[in-house]
Amino acid sequence: MKKNISRLTYIGVTLSVLTGVFSCDKTIEEPQRVGYTPASVDEKAGAWKTYLLASAEEISVPAPTAVTSSDYVAELSALKGLASNLSQEQKEAVVYWGAGAVYRWNEIARELAARYNIPPASNADGKYPVPDAANPLADPKFPFANPPYTSRALAYLSVAQYDALVSAWNFKYKFKRSAPSKVDASIPAALPVSALPSYPSEDAVVAAASVTILKAMFPGEVPYLDAKLKEHLASRQWAGMNVTSDLTAGTNLGNAVAAKVMGRARTDGMGAANNQALTAGMIEAAKSRGIKEPWLSQEGPARPPMLPNFGAVQTWNFDRKTLEQIRPVIPYVVGSAEWQKELDELKSIQNKQTREQARIANYWADGAGSYTPPGHWHRAAANAAHEAKFSEIKMARTLALVGTAEMDAGIACWETKYYYYTPRPQQFGLKTSVGLPNFPSYTSGHSTFSAAAATVLAYIFPDQADKFNAQAQEASVSRIYGLIHYRIDCELGLKHGKVIGDYAIARGKADGSGL
């Protein structure tokens, strides 16, 4: 990476020239964002509790050269000489990445999730081929970024970003190297310069950690991710924000932290999440619990159920025993008077669906080609943090709390779904226009994901609690309006999600941030 950085030609530009210009090809429309001076630089964040690093100093970072040294003076001279005559494309890159490293890499991850959220089609033999991580661009492409997969990808991304930034903050305030423009006022800074020390570069830390995780999660996108990494690092010198040694130290730290995070990912049980050999036993176990009519795929040909063993994947904020203890009890089953009442409610909606009900069902559908409910809530979290002018590390903390809650919600919900294996309304003649999920009904994934995220966001942004909770309620009821869930699936999914969110909050309250 050092060689790549040193070979780039960098030039700078003032922020007044850059305002309003962006450079990213987006398949999903996102709000335009620009850089800001954070409300707080969170100078004590190097002491915050990490998820996987034993301490903020587990990975060593060498001390930088003094700002009076000949080596650093040479770096400043190179930066100054390159900080002029930017091309329009370079100007656009400065503004795009200046909106925030954590913000942009989360956005990129969501776009990749949407791009890969396409279920495999059946072949001529009536079989559904399984995407192959070793050949990710073959048909069907790997991964199928369904809600559980996306929740996991975003969780690992956010944890890597957060742990890497906690370590970076520790070394920033240990070494206290000032930003280049504060050492040499003749260097034009094209983005807001805060009191945050520059070594190691927070942007390089986030970029390197993010690319390592995303290459593992989306292995067919390696050239694209390498290009984004190169552009991000270059933009920091085009903007006059970092010298090469800032970037090199940050890149090395981000790579090392991400390698540790991927160590967990390789052993968390995801490799067995699609074990279809387990489904026969799951169905028999569900029958022993009173489920007389288990779920059946309504696709033709019948599609194997989505990730039946995702419920066995390792959680973040509670252990396996707790997962089983908080599993919702199913209050009634197919054939009961209570179930019939809920089926009749769906039939009534099918016959007399209002425009508002249809709008809500479609707005929250988050089906194929979208970044799914976990991505929807990550976007809400990132936007709220950006609007609040959070520092990079506080933004990363926000997304790590939401991300781990969302992955835990996916695991706990999927464990519940295959524990009870209940049929969807479509097995009893109802139709849907929002896409029919290929897995059991109870409980609602949308409800569980949404309540978990809204609970965490209400803790982080208490002045917006009512808004987030109302959105979770709407996301939940959207599945009733879409005719793919019974009311009990949604109501108990919401309760389950809130409990899961509360575990993430407990972790947040104990992380040393005082937030």
Language model features with spans:
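Hydrophobic helical h-region of N-terminal Sec-dependent signal peptides
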Residues: 13-17
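Acidic/polar surface patches and capping/hinge elements
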Residues: 25-515
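Bacterial N-terminal signal peptides that target proteins for export
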Residues: 2-11
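C-terminal motif of bacterial Sec signal peptides marking the signal peptidase cleavage site
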Residues: 19-23
